[in-house]
Amino acid sequence: MYDNIAILTNTMNNNSVEVEADNMRPGKSFDAYIASNKIRMFWNGKVYVGNAHGMEFTSSGPKLIN
């Protein structure tokens, strides 16, 4: 089971925000929700990457919880 919180970082300015995470598929993808906007994050082999409104975001994904 995974936490419902993740940290997204904007690659242009390195600003990080806490977002709601859902539909986690380890090593594949998860959905990040920020200000009611959904950003689909895809695994690139190192981090999850997603694009919205002309900006790129990265994340290590939500934490695994027991």
Explain the meaning of each model-derived region.
Residues 1-66:
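Cysteine-centric segments in proteins
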